[in-house]
Amino acid sequence: MYAVVKTGGKQYKVAAGEKLKVEQIPADIGAEITLDQVLAVGAGDQIKFGTPLVSGASVKATVISQGRHDKVKIFKMRRRKHYQKRQGHRQNYTELRIEAIVA
């Protein structure tokens, strides 16, 4: 069984037992959270799509860790004008383990 969930402005296809890195969720390590925005649920040939959400469906997950992704380097330059601008960015993430899909 799998589900398509929306969190942090992105959509993820998940199944029970998988690990998943999502945008940061303010929760303690080891806490169990519920993802309520389920867009689709499927098992084998049967797929149930929501309009826009599947009513009564949710995904239970446990927070494994909180961290930061690798640095992304931004470099802007204007040729022949001696203009250079450097910037770096590290995005925070939350790693989840999907425990169960309730449909």
Swiss-Prot record:
GO terms for biological process: translation. One of its GO terms (cellular component) is cytoplasm. Keywords: Ribonucleoprotein, Ribosomal protein, RNA-binding, rRNA-binding. InterPro entries: bL21-like, bL21-like_sf, Ribosomal_bL21, Ribosomal_bL21_CS. GO terms for molecular function: rRNA binding; structural constituent of ribosome. Pfam families: Ribosomal_L21p (PF00829). Disulfide bonds: none annotated. The keyword Transmembrane does not apply. NCBIfam families: L21 (TIGR00061). Part of the 50S ribosomal subunit. Contacts protein L20. PANTHER family: 50S RIBOSOMAL PROTEIN L21, LARGE RIBOSOMAL SUBUNIT PROTEIN BL21M. This protein binds to 23S rRNA in the presence of protein L20. Belongs to the bacterial ribosomal protein bL21 family. This is Large ribosomal subunit protein bL21. It comes from Cupriavidus necator (strain ATCC 17699 / DSM 428 / KCTC 22496 / NCIMB 10442 / H16 / Stanier 337) (Ralstonia eutropha).
